[in-house]
């Protein structure tokens, strides 16, 4: 994203709107999300799946130590695209809020409410001087009470929206196009996972292949209501079905 000289006076302070109604620091935060590794989520009647891509910036990087899908509580998880350090802070906050809700009310936190709490923090960092917006978008998904699948995405601006399928990061546009052509709500859990993996595969360059070491997959099915991450062996097995 590039701005002309006339815009430069408005991108120095986060609290100043440009004449066209933009907050340029928030727009820049969206650019950080677009540079992140591809991350996506899918919701069907069977449940919710979150998939995060892992890439080696250098051959010396141990990608096995990198997490892209996180468990927030027994019934909900998340993934992100953008600045990893910003994502870590928000994930820790979401976990603490989910735990606090369980301790006080003795029940799992509502996923919409948890997403709102995270989004409120993001929004707060768009209207105060001396801070910057979070350069990260989170996809949050799981099973709410009543066996209701939920999938939401939070933006750097603090806005959050529910989705049937959503993709962010470098391959977000391509994966979204794949979802628009192939999404069906009546898929079973295995086919929901396969849909997400195929959407991620559609973002690869010619000659590239998905491997169990460069993706993370988490899912929650309506039968168990539990969010869990797939093991290396499970990822290897599901990739063989592509």
From Swiss-Prot:
<dbReference type="GO" id="GO:0005737">
    <property type="term" value="C:cytoplasm"/>
</dbReference>
<dbReference type="InterPro" id="IPR029055">
    <property type="entry name" value="Ntn_hydrolases_N"/>
</dbReference>
<dbReference type="GO" id="GO:0010498">
    <property type="term" value="P:proteasomal protein catabolic process"/>
</dbReference>
<comment type="function">
    <text>Component of the proteasome core, a large protease complex with broad specificity involved in protein degradation.</text>
</comment>
<dbReference type="InterPro" id="IPR023332">
    <property type="entry name" value="Proteasome_alpha-type"/>
</dbReference>
<dbReference type="Pfam" id="PF10584">
    <property type="entry name" value="Proteasome_A_N"/>
</dbReference>
<dbReference type="InterPro" id="IPR000426">
    <property type="entry name" value="Proteasome_asu_N"/>
</dbReference>
<dbReference type="InterPro" id="IPR050115">
    <property type="entry name" value="Proteasome_alpha"/>
</dbReference>
<dbReference type="InterPro" id="IPR001353">
    <property type="entry name" value="Proteasome_sua/b"/>
</dbReference>
<comment type="similarity">
    <text>Belongs to the peptidase T1A family.</text>
</comment>
<dbReference type="Pfam" id="PF00227">
    <property type="entry name" value="Proteasome"/>
</dbReference>
<comment type="subunit">
    <text>The 20S proteasome core is composed of 14 alpha and 14 beta subunits that assemble into four stacked heptameric rings, resulting in a barrel-shaped structure. The two inner rings, each composed of seven catalytic beta subunits, are sandwiched by two outer rings, each composed of seven alpha subunits. The catalytic chamber with the active sites is on the inside of the barrel. Has a gated structure, the ends of the cylinder being occluded by the N-termini of the alpha-subunits. Is capped at one or both ends by the proteasome regulatory ATPase, PAN.</text>
</comment>
<keyword id="KW-0647">Proteasome</keyword>
<dbReference type="GO" id="GO:0019773">
    <property type="term" value="C:proteasome core complex, alpha-subunit complex"/>
</dbReference>
<dbReference type="InterPro" id="IPR019982">
    <property type="entry name" value="Proteasome_asu_arc"/>
</dbReference>
<keyword id="KW-0963">Cytoplasm</keyword>
<dbReference type="GO" id="GO:0006511">
    <property type="term" value="P:ubiquitin-dependent protein catabolic process"/>
</dbReference>
<dbReference type="GO" id="GO:0004298">
    <property type="term" value="F:threonine-type endopeptidase activity"/>
</dbReference>
<protein>
    <recommendedName>
        <fullName>Proteasome subunit alpha</fullName>
    </recommendedName>
</protein>
């Amino acid at each position: 994203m590039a701005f002309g000289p006339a815009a430069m006076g408005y991108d120095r302070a986060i609290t100043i709107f440009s004449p066209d109604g933009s907050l340029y620091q928030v727009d820049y935060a969206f650019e950080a999300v677009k540079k992140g590794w591809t991350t996506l989520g899918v919701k069907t009647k069977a449940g919710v799946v979150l998939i995060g891509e892992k890439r080696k910036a250098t051959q010396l990087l141990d990608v096995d130590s990198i997490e892209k899908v996180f468990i927030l509580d027994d019934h909900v998880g998340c993934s992100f695209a953008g600045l990893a350090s910003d994502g870590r802070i928000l994930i820790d906050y979401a976990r603490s809020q989910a735990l606090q809700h369980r301790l006080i009310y003795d029940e799992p936190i509502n996923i919409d409410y948890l997403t709102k709490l995270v989004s409120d923090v993001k929004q707060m960092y768009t209207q105060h001087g001396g801070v910057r917006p979070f350069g990260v978008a989170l996809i949050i998904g799981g099973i709410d009470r009543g066996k209701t699948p939920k999938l939401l995405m939070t933006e750097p601006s603090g806005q959050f929206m529910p989705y049937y399928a959503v993709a962010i990061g470098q391959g977000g546009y391509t994966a979204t196009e794949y979802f628009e052509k192939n999404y069906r709500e009546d898929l079973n859990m295995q086919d929901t996972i396969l849909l997400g993996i195929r959407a991620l595969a559609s973002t690869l360059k010619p000659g590239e292949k998905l491997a169990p070491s460069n993706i993370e997959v988490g899912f929650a099915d309506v039968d168990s209501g539990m969010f869990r991450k797939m093991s290396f062996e499970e990822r290897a097995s599901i990739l063989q079905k592509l």
